[in-house]
Amino acid sequence: MFNEITKSVTWNGQVLELSTGKIARQADGAVTVKMGNSVLLCTAVVANKAKEGIGLLPLTINYREMAYAAGKIPGGFFKHEGKASDREVLVSRLIDRPIRPLFHPAFVNETHVTCSVLSYDPETPVDILAIIGASAALSLSPAPYLEIVAASKVGLINGEFVLNPTLALLKTSQLDLVVAGTSGSVMMVESEAHLLSEEQMLEAVKFGFESFQPVIKIIKELAEEAKKPKLEMQALYPASLKKEIEKLFVKEIEQAFAIKSKQERSTNLDLIPEKVLTHFVSDIENKKYSNYQIESALKAIESDILRNEILEKNRRIDGRSTTDIRQIACEIGLLPSAHGSALFTRGETQSLVSTTFGTSLDEQIVDSLEGEYKERFMLNYIFPPYSVNEAMPMKAPSRREVGHGKLAWRAINPILPNKVQFPYSIRVVAETTESNGSSSMATVCGSSLALMYAGVPIKAPVAGIAMGLVKEGKNFAVLSDILGDEDYFGDMDFKVAGTSEGITALQMDIKISGVDFKIMKVALEQARLGRLHILEQMNKVISKPNNELSKNAPSTTTIKIDKDKIRDIIGPSGKVIKEICETSGAKIDISDDGTVSVYASDRDKLKVALDKIKAIVVEPEIGEIFNGTVVKVLDSGAFINYVGNKDGFVHISEVSGERIETVSSVLKQGDIVKVKLIGFDNKGKAKLTIKNADKDKSSNNTKPKTHVNNTKDNSEPEQRRDSSKKRAWNEDNNAEIAEVITERKYFN
């Protein structure tokens, strides 16, 4: 029934298996990828008809993580997979980027690639397996997919490169790098690094590139046996058409490109297509040429003009040389109510960034195949239509926005303080208010400025720069700080972020059949010089974090209590902690280890919450004096709430130094009285006295006194508390509330 074909290779000590012919046989290409206990199904479907006139390849990549792959049922009200998570969006983009440039330029058929994780093994990199599976599925399909791609993940642990490190190993790694490419060149790089040098990054890319070559071999072997006939492709446009357009319109195009302002240049360039189509209207009616062919030829001419200016004259469309950086302007603190803010402008690209502090309760909860975890640092990148003067409605974050935000997150995350050094959760929002290239790197620069102004003790300022490439044969030019048009018509988008000491994030996308390591080395060094220049400009405005947080930032403190006291603070069904939060206006977060974090908008609210917590967790000791509240009066005595939620009993004989007939003649419910703890009965219930309590030094915080119980009840041994026992409240953390409350200084 099945004509299954399987190819396998031992890769990094594990067997990687690719098979086709058993599952999803009606898809144009379908490959099952197995490694360890991970199983992925990758399919490719190609539409029969071309979709002309859209100006780009209609390729859609969908990566899905099925909950059952990890033996889980999806959370939420609807128990099925919903919209794509950020993780799924990011991996979908990771698959798309090395694959998209390798289709025939004239191919415009709708193409859908789906990669589903059916079984999950945390010891294997499923994102890497998805890239491999997608490449294999396309190789089997009719799509004119010109070269085969594979990928690998690289870590750096104890100075050694590690191939496809596990999730556990990545936690100790200085590098998390994904490399994808063909048998001859690198197509895509994505990484987060902890201040690595350019040389280390280049060596890591080489290591990853060499590591996936055996995988390309088995994909080729599988395709040779199982591939379907490829679609025959024609040239995108006749060469004669391009020559005719050049002859008639090249001067006008050159004049438009000579305009340095983006808006004016775009306006003039947008007028040309209509003139060209009008000139060829009879040829279009006679079906000699199509609109799409004419527009494609025109775009090719525009590309040639821009590229020739750079390669032959070392001149870019805004007049800069290949290494020049656009003019930079930095401003901080422009949003008075925000905890931190900055405006970073580089040429016609601008990012408005704000920083907000929250509590551990504000951390982002992420549900993944590995399990649920929290993200303390959040960075949201927003790209509104007005930033490029487009009249469009604002929508939910696009895949591009999610991807750019994650790149900026990777750049900033390595230099943030840990939770002990800085107990807040942090949200950064970067809104691109103008865009003409490299908006994600403007986000990195603006985020660094806003964090420093907000008082976050980051390790060092971070800047980012986007590099471009124009390559014709062996001749090439690497461009620093690229414009939007240079990105569109160029061959590479190479983004590097880091401090003056090293790289924190790297992303490379290629539009041609790949680049060699010589070009990458030049690009990395040129990016380093550009990054240092940008940092120099940023440092003129702010070079280190402010010593104090904004007055709008919440106050916070963290204390330690005995773990067995956690339930007392929480109370039945959360009643106690809810009451503390409501009456104080503070937020409280309690960890399983007894760490209690208290957050409030001001010091007074924080003190109220701390006092209430102290009253609950304090271990009362014999001889201490308390201000108590009468809660119930009986004939034999009275129950008095003397600290927190603790009640004690005052016998009628301990109510007064004089004989009384009834307790109610002296005490009434709600009365505030001074009481002394004199012991505990055999059930651990507190015994209190009012006699002579007001003559002793009265304080709810007096030092514990040794007290010998003088109760007349000798039927049971006295159950006394050891006066040397430490309180559940850690006094070192509470020397004085004013010292505990943050003074907005977090520097050692």
Swiss-Prot record:
Belongs to the polyribonucleotide nucleotidyltransferase family. The keyword Magnesium applies. Its EC number is 2.7.7.8. CDD domains: KH-I_PNPase (cd02393), RNase_PH_PNPase_1 (cd11363), RNase_PH_PNPase_2 (cd11364). GO terms for molecular function: 3'-5'-RNA exonuclease activity; magnesium ion binding; polyribonucleotide nucleotidyltransferase activity; RNA binding. Residues 713-722 have a biased composition (Basic and acidic residues). Residues 699-712 have a biased composition (Polar residues). It comes from Rickettsia peacockii (strain Rustic). One of its GO terms (cellular component) is cytosol. It catalyses: RNA(n+1) + phosphate = RNA(n) + a ribonucleoside 5'-diphosphate. It is found in: Cytoplasm. Residues 554-613 form the KH domain. This is Polyribonucleotide nucleotidyltransferase. The gene is pnp.
